[in-house]
């Protein structure tokens, strides 16, 4: 009986030590990582034809989403807010078409007094041929984010690249 326990324990330890241990990745290929550098929690919804359940993104933490396809056509919008009611949101919008990702940032539904505007945000991509976005802290009219529905801020890049949206560039 003791022999069986020793063998079982040895097997468990050998298996556990063989498993790779790595910290959570900063960004993922084929998706987007959102990093919350604000001093408050943020609330996220991934919206296609319907909204996903709300996700709380604690201060100092990150959230990852692999590219989704809208089953009813059109794109996906990750809505990012400072309150749980879903109002006053910054949006990371994307549509995956084959190997391309068409994406943009939208501040249309974001008030000028939002902590997200005060903190600033940027999108970086691990493919240097791709356009990125930087909206400086306090820039209420950032030209790199949609302010009006008829703006021209949609970008395209490889869908296999790793995209990182950093919320709170001032910290």
UniProtKB/Swiss-Prot annotation:
Induction (record text): Expression is inhibited by PKA activity but is not subject to glucose repression. Not expressed in dormant conidia but only during germination.
Main subcellular localisation: secreted
Description of the deletion phenotype: No visible phenotype. The double deletion of cetA and calA results in cell wall defects and lyse during germination, leading to the inhibition of germination.
Span of the signal peptide: 1-18
Cell compartments where the protein resides: Secreted; Secreted, Extracellular space, Extracellular matrix; Secreted, Cell wall
Keywords for this protein: Cell wall, Disulfide bond, Extracellular matrix, Germination, Glycoprotein, Secreted, Signal
Keyword Glycoprotein assigned: yes
InterPro entries with a match to the protein in the record: CetA-like, Osmotin/thaumatin-like_sf
GO CC term, one of those recorded: extracellular region
Pfam families named among the record's database cross-references: Bys1 (PF04681)
Record GO biological process: spore germination
Cystine pairs: 130-157, 135-142
Glycosylation sites: 37, 141
Task of the protein: Secreted thaumatin-like protein that, with cetA, plays an essential role in early conidial germination with a possible role in cell wall remodeling.
Family from the record: Belongs to the thaumatin family.
Protein name (Swiss-Prot/TrEMBL): Secreted thaumatin-like protein calA
């Amino acid at each position: 009986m003791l022999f069986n326990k020793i063998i079982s324990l040895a097997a468990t330890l050998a298996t556990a030590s063989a498993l790779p241990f790595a910290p959570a990745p900063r960004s993922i290929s084929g998706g987007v990582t959102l990093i919350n550098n604000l001093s408050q929690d943020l609330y996220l919804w991934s919206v296609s034809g319907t909204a996903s359940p709300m996700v709380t993104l604690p201060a100092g933490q990150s959230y990852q989403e692999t590219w989704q396809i809208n089953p009813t056509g059109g794109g996906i919008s990750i809505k990012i807010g400072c309150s749980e009611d879903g109002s006053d949101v910054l949006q990371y919008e994307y549509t995956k078409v084959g190997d391309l990702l068409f994406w943009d940032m939208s501040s249309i539904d974001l008030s000028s007094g939002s902590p997200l505007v005060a903190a600033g945000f940027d999108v970086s991509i691990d493919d240097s041929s791709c356009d990125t976005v930087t909206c400086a802290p306090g820039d209420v009219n950032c030209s790199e984010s949609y302010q009006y529905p008829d703006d021209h801020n949609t970008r395209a890049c490889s869908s296999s690249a790793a995209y990182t949206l950093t919320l709170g560039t001032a910290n």
